[in-house]
């Protein structure tokens, strides 16, 4: 039996929901929102976004629940279409997050919370990370409801808070406090979740590829703490915490440049699909030649950096704090370091190595540690994603991959739920898509949504509907 949701999909409604959600400044942390919110109330932004989604689903007769699992204003929303009759299979989850990172509004060409639609492009914070997917998953839920299709499993919509800061107020907290939200009436956790950071197209040479995320790196957010002797800036001495911190950060950068590569299976398969077998072959034995081969094959710098980061553990200093006054030698200083680990890396051993690298200049302290995760790339739902992409774009090639960021998939792994990154978008080769994540002038073409919405709906219908 063929299930066709296309007649029930509302692209205009999807775009409207995206624009409306962008106009809700659900910035994480909330206190980072006021200046950028252009007079709009920034408090409770995530709960406001959750209530918006709940109202859309409630209006269609879909049961919903808004939950503030830890703190007022840090809300998430769950919606559920129940199986028609007894569920024969565990649920499918449509997972997204409604929080967004802060903006530097002065660096934007348009109001980052305006949701402007200009020349077929929607602008605003969250347009690609990831309110576009929230809107598409809302549209799919509405289409399932309108169609009256019989479901063999529950379909759960989950748009959660706090993904951008580890999920304590969102997925992580909900998994711990309300695991039943991720399961059916028989207590079976979801068989799969469709999540972010995959599905989009990348162009390599003259070929177009569609990514399907089947793994993601681990996270160890780390603090460097340097201490010294405070004093007057006019009388320098050798125990300056600022100098120690700078030396520690410099040592980390030099160590990163020497860090060896390790090609994990998900990355080896991705490189093979892209025709970059030579990069995979050389990465572990001749890094200079591997780098040259990668540079020659991938001229686009952000994609090239992404692939390079797939090949090794990384430690990136991102935040520095030292000193409060120009004429005072700091007695302490801190740096924040974003450490990302490949599947199979011993995170404690890597931290020990980083401590050796910085030596006595600073103390290395882990703040948040989350493991790398991997899922089978031959799962039924991956096959459905591949089939739907090939049908929609016969000239494109699906490619399973590992991503370097982290997602709420790490929290759901505690329940045994595999999360596949699949927010399908067909993008022109000149769209700097990867650089728009957390970047200025975040935006998404409506044409990309027009491609992706029926592809996503096809996967959901084939996986969830009764045959």
Language model region names:
Residues 88-159:
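Active-site metal-coordination/substrate-binding segment of hydrolases
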Residues 197-198, 210-221, 422, 426-434, ...:
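Flexible glycine/proline-rich, aromatic-decorated loop/lid segments
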């Amino acid at each position: 039996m063929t299930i066709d949701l296309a007649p029930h999909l509302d692209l205009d409604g999807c775009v409207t929901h995206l624009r409306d959600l962008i106009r809700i400044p659900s910035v994480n942390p909330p206190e980072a929102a006021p200046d950028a919110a252009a007079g709009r109330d920034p408090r409770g932004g995530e709960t406001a976004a959750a209530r918006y989604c709940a109202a859309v689903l409630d209006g269609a007769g879909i049961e919903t629940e808004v939950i503030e699992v830890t703190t007022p204003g840090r809300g998430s929303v769950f919606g559920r279409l129940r199986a028609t009759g007894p569920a024969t299979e565990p649920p499918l989850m449509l997972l997204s997050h409604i929080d967004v990172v802060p903006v530097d509004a002065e660096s934007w060409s348009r109001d980052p919370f305006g949701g402007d639609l200009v020349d077929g492009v929607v602008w605003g914070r969250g347009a690609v990370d990831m309110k576009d997917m929230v809107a598409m998953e809302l549209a799919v839920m509405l289409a399932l409801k309108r169609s009256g299709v019989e479901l063999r499993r529950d379909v759960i919509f989950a748009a959660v808070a706090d993904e951008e800061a580890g999920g304590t107020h969102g997925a992580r907290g909900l998994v711990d406090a309300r695991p039943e939200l991720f399961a059916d009436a028989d207590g079976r956790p979801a068989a799969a979740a469709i999540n972010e950071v995959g599905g989009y197209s990348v162009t390599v040479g003259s070929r177009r590829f569609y990514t399907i995320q089947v793994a993601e790196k681990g996270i160890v957010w780390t603090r460097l703490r340097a201490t010294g002797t405070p004093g007057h800036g006019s009388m320098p001495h050798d125990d300056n915490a600022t100098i120690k911190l700078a030396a520690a950060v410099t040592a980390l950068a030099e160590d990163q440049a020497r860090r060896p590569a390790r090609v994990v299976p998900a990355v080896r398969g991705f490189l093979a699909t892209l025709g970059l077998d030579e990069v995979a072959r050389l990465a572990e034995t001749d890094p200079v030649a591997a780098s040259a081969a990668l540079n020659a094959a991938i001229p686009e710098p952000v994609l090239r950096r992404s692939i390079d980061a797939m090949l090794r553990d990384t430690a990136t200093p991102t935040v520095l704090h030292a000193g409060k006054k120009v004429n005072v030698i700091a007695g302490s200083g801190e740096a924040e370091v974003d450490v990302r680990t490949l599947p199979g890396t011993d995170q404690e051993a890597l931290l020990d190595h980083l401590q050796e690298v910085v030596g006595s200049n600073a103390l290395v302290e882990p703040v948040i540690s989350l493991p790398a995760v991997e899922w089978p790339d031959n799962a039924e739902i991956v096959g459905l994603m591949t089939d739907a992409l090939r049908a929609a774009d016969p000239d494109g090639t699906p490619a399973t991959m590992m991503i370097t960021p982290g997602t709420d998939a790490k929290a759901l792994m505690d329940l045994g739920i595999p999360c596949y990154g699949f927010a399908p978008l067909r993008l022109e080769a000149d769209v700097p898509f990867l650089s728009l994540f957390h970047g200025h002038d975040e935006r998404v073409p409506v044409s990309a949504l027009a491609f992706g919405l029926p592809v996503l709906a096809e996967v959901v219908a084939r996986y969830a509907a009764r045959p």
